[in-house]
C-alpha cells in the first residue's frame, strides 16, 4: 500500500501548486455524523490544507450549493454524479476500491436475499424491498432499470415512483416522496421528519442501511453493492445465510458476485464545478489527507472509516485511495454509456427508447460537413440524423457518449478511437483506375501512399534537406499529414520538438499562436485560424496542398492522389483552376525526387485507408445502414448524382474522401489493431510518447 497508493495519487499532479490555497475547500456534508467527521478532518489537516464543513439536508442540496459557489466538493454515487452534470459539475477524483494488488474504480450492483425463499429476480412483484436511496446506482437506477419490463409503467409523464410503489408491496426508498407514494417509505424507520430521509438520519439509508433492512427481516430483498454483505457480516457462517439474485433468474452465493451481479458501476466520485471549481485545491487536499490518514497510515482519525455503528461517512469505508480523473472526462464519460443508457431508460417512454435505438447519428466536423450531412439526411429513407462537433476528437467523444454513432476517420484517429474502445465498421476503398465495377464491397482495402509534395521550381529541397523549410500538414494526429512524416523525423533526429523541425508550419489542431500555426489562414474572414476543421482553408488533404500551391509552404504532406485531384482542371475552385500536376514533384526517402504520378515508387509510407468507426454494440446496425445508403447514393448508386452523392463534396472530402469508390467490408479486421496493422500501431504508439493527448489520457482512465 505504501508504494501503490501514493503512486496513484501522484498521477496528474505535475504542475500542481502544492502551496495551501488562500481559501480552503468547503466540503459539503448531509448528516450530523458526517459533519462531526468532517470537523475532525478539518482540525487534523488545517495546517497544510485549510478546509471548511458545509452542511446541507441531502446530496441534491449539496450539488446545488456547489453550483451556487456556497460549497466546493462532495462525494457522490454514480446516479448523483449524473444529476450533478445538469448543474455543470464534473467528477475530479474517483474512489479506489479492492486491494493494493487488485485496485479497482468500480463496484458491482447486486440484489441480496435470504436463503430459504425460492423467488428469483423475475418474481419480485409483491415483495418487500430495501433500497440505498432514490436515484442512486446500486439501490435504484440499476435494479429498477432491469425491472422496468415488469412494471406497469408506460414512461413519462407518469411518475416512475408511482409504478415502483405498485410493484413492491412495501419498500424503504430513502429520498422518495413519502407523501405521494407512502408505500415507498413504509419500511423506513427514521423518527418524525427523518423517516425516509435522504441521509443517515434514516437508519435504512445507504448500503449498510438497506442491508440492515433485509437483515432484520423487514424486507425480502436489498439492492446494494457486492462488498456490503462482507462489511456487515465478517463471519462466513453469517454470510452463508444470504444469496444473490442473478439476471438469468438463478441464485448464487454472495462470494460469486463477479458472475452474479446486476451491473458493474463506476465508483463514487468527488465532484466540483466544471469552471472555477478549485480542482487543484481539492486534489491536493485529498492527496495530503490520504497520505496522512489513509489505511496505510493508522491514526486516531481515519479518512476511510466511520466511528461506531456509522457507515460510509464522507467516503465509502471500503476506499483505499483516490485516482485523479483526467480533465477531459465529464460526468457522462465517467459513468460510461451502459450506465447512461440505463438512466435514460428510466426517463423515456418505451416508444422513445425504441426510436433512439433505431436511429443512426452521423457526426460532422465543422459547418461544411454538417451541411452535407443534412443534405444526406433529407434524402435518406432511413432514420439518419446529424450532430456537429468542432474537431475530430470531439466527434469521437460524442460517439463514446452515445450522442453520435459513427463517422469516417483517417488512420491516426482510428488509432485514437480504438484506444477509446471504438471499432472499425467499413473501409473507404479508393476509386480503382483498373476497374469500373461496382462489385467491390468485398475487395480488400489496400490503403494509400503518404507523400511529401514540393513545387518543381523549388529544386533545392530533398527529403534530406526538408528540415528548416516551411511545411503544410493536413492536421495534427492525421496519418499522411502528421503521423508518418513527423514519426520519420522523430526517428531521424531523436527529438520530439515538433515546432523546431520546420521554420514555420500550418498544422491545424496545434496550439494557436505557435510556430506550427504560423502559416494557417483561417476562413475567408480570417477567423478560426489553425482549427482542425474545414473552417481553416489549409485543413485536410486539399487544404495542405493549397497551402503549398499558394506559396505559403515549401512542402505539403498529403496522400498520393491529392495533387491529381486538384490539378489539370479536376478542382474548379479559383485557387486551383490553373494548377498543373507537372508543376509539382514528390520527395523520395532516398533523397531523390519523382513526378507526382510515381507515388508507388516514391512515398513516405503506405497508410491504412480511412474507415468508418462506431461503438461495438452499434457496429452491425451502422454497417447495414451504410451499405443500404451506398446502394442508393454511392458512386454507382441509383440516386447519384440526381439526388445526392456520398462521395462528392462542394469543397473537398466532406464526411468521406471524394475518391472513395466504395465502402468495403473489413475481411475480419474488426479491431483497430487488425485494421491498422501492427507496424502502424507501433509507429503511432512511439510517436505518441512525444506528447500528451488529453483524449488518450481520458480513454486510458476509462478503459482501465
From Swiss-Prot:
Signal peptide location: 1-19
This protein's GO CC annotations: early endosome; extracellular space; plasma membrane; recycling endosome; specific granule
Localization (cell): Secreted; Cytoplasmic granule
Residue stretches in coiled coil: none
List of glycosylated residues: 385, 491
Pfam family, one: Transferrin
EC number: 3.4.21.-
Positions of hydrogencarbonate 1 binding: 132, 136, 138-139
Quaternary structure and interacting proteins, as annotated: Monomer. Found in a complex with LTF, CLU, EPPIN and SEMG1. Found in a complex with MPO and LTF; interacts directly with CP, allows Fe(3+) incorporation into LTF and activation of CP ferroxidase activity.
Protein name per the record: Lactotransferrin
Organism: Sus scrofa
Gene name of the encoded protein: LTF
Amino acid at each position: 500500500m505504501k508504494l501503490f497508493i501514493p503512486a496513484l495519487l501522484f498521477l496528474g499532479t505535475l504542475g500542481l501548486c502544492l502551496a495551501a490555497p488562500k481559501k480552503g475547500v468547503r466540503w459539503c456534508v448531509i448528516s450530523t455524523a458526517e459533519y462531526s467527521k468532517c470537523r475532525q478532518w478539518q482540525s487534523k489537516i488545517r495546517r497544510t490544507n485549510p478546509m471548511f464543513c458545509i452542511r446541507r439536508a441531502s446530496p441534491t442540496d449539496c450539488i446545488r450549493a456547489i453550483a451556487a459557489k456556497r460549497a466546493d466538493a462532495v462525494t457522490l454515487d454514480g446516479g448523483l454524479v449524473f444529476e450533478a452534470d445538469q448543474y455543470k459539475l464534473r467528477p475530479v477524483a474517483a474512489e479506489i476500491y479492492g486491494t493494493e494488488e487488485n485496485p479497482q474504480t468500480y463496484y458491482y450492483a447486486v440484489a441480496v436475499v435470504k436463503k430459504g425463499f425460492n423467488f428469483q429476480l423475475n418474481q419480485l412483484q409483491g415483495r418487500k424491498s430495501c433500497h440505498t436511496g432514490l436515484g442512486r446506482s446500486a439501490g435504484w437506477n440499476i435494479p429498477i432499470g432491469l425491472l422496468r419490463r415488469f412494471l406497469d409503467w408506460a414512461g413519462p409523464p407518469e411518475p416512475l415512483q408511482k409504478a415502483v410503489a405498485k410493484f413492491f408491496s412495501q419498500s424503504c426508498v430513502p429520498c422518495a416522496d413519502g407523501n405521494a407514494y407512502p408505500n415507498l417509505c413504509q419500511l423506513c424507520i427514521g423518527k418524525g421528519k427523518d423517516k425516509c430521509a435522504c441521509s443517515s438520519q434514516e437508519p435504512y439509508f445507504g448500503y449498510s442501511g438497506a442491508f440492515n433492512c433485509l437483515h432484520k427481516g423487514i424486507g425480502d430483498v436489498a439492492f446494494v453493492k457486492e462488498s456490503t454483505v462482507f462489511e456487515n457480516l465478517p463471519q462466513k457462517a453469517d454470510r452463508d445465510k444470504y444469496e444473490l439474485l442473478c439476471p438469468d433468474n438463478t441464485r448464487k452465493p454472495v462470494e460469486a458476485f463477479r458472475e452474479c451481479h446486476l451491473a458493474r458501476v463506476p465508483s463514487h466520485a468527488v465532484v466540483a464545478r466544471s469552471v472555477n471549481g478549485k480542482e487543484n485545491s481539492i486534489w491536493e487536499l485529498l492527496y495530503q489527507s490520504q497520505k496522512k490518514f489513509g489505511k496505510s497510515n493508522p491514526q486516531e482519525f481515519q479518512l476511510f472509516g466511520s466511528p461506531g455503528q456509522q457507515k460510509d461517512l464522507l467516503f465509502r469505508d471500503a476506499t483505499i485511495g483516490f485516482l485523479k480523473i483526467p480533465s477531459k472526462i465529464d460526468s457522462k464519460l465517467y459513468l460510461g454509456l451502459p450506465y447512461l443508457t440505463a438512466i435514460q431508460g428510466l426517463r423515456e417512454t418505451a416508444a422513445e427508447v425504441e426510436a433512439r435505438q433505431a436511429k443512426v447519428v452521423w457526426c460532422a466536423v465543422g459547418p461544411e460537413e454538417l451541411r452535407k450531412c443534412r443534405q444526406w439526411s433529407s434524402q435518406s429513407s432511413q432514420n439518419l440524423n446529424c450532430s456537429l462537433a468542432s474537431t475530430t476528437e470531439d466527434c469521437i467523444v460524442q460517439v463514446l457518449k452515445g450522442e453520435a454513432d459513427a463517422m469516417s476517420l483517417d488512420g491516426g484517429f482510428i488509432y485514437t478511437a480504438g484506444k477509446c474502445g471504438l471499432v472499425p465498421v467499413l473501409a473507404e476503398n479508393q476509386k480503382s483506375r483498373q476497374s469500373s465495377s461496382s462489385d467491390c464491397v468485398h475487395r480488400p482495402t489496400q490503403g494509400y501512399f503518404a507523400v511529401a509534395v514540393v513545387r518543381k521550381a523549388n529544386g533545392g529541397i530533398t527529403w534530406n534537406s526538408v528540415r528548416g523549410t516551411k511545411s503544410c500538414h493536413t492536421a495534427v494526429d492525421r496519418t499522411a499529414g502528421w503521423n508518418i512524416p513527423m514519426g520519420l523525423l522523430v526517428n531521424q533526429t531523436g527529438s520530439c520538438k515538433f515546432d523546431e523541425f520546420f521554420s514555420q508550419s500550418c498544422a491545424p489542431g496545434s496550439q494557436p499562436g505557435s510556430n506550427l500555426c504560423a502559416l494557417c489562414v483561417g476562413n475567408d474572414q480570417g477567423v478560426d485560424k489553425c482549427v482542425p476543421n474545414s473552417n481553416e482553408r489549409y485543413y485536410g488533404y486539399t487544404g495542405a496542398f493549397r497551402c503549398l500551391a499558394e506559396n505559403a509552404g515549401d512542402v505539403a504532406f498529403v496522400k498520393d492522389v491529392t495533387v491529381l485531384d486538384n490539378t489539370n482542371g479536376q478542382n474548379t475552385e479559383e485557387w486551383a483552376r490553373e494548377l498543373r500536376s507537372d508543376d509539382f514533384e514528390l520527395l523520395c526517402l532516398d533523397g531523390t525526387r519523382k513526378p507526382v504520378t510515381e507515388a508507388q515508387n516514391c512515398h513516405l509510407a503506405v497508410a491504412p485507408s480511412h474507415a468508418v468507426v462506431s461503438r461495438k454494440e452499434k457496429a452491425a446496425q451502422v454497417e447495414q445502414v451504410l451499405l443500404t445508403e451506398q446502394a442508393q447514393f454511392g458512386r454507382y448508386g441509383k440516386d447519384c448524382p440526381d439526388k445526392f452523392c456520398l462521395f462528392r463534396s462542394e469543397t473537398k472530402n466532406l464526411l468521406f474522401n471524394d475518391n472513395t469508390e466504395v465502402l468495403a467490408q473489413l475481411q475480419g479486421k474488426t479491431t483497430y489493431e487488425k485494421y491498422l496493422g501492427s507496424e502502424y500501431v507501433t509507429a503511432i504508439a512511439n510517436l505518441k510518447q512525444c506528447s500528451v493527448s488529453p483524449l488518450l489520457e481520458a480513454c486510458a482512465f476509462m478503459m482501465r
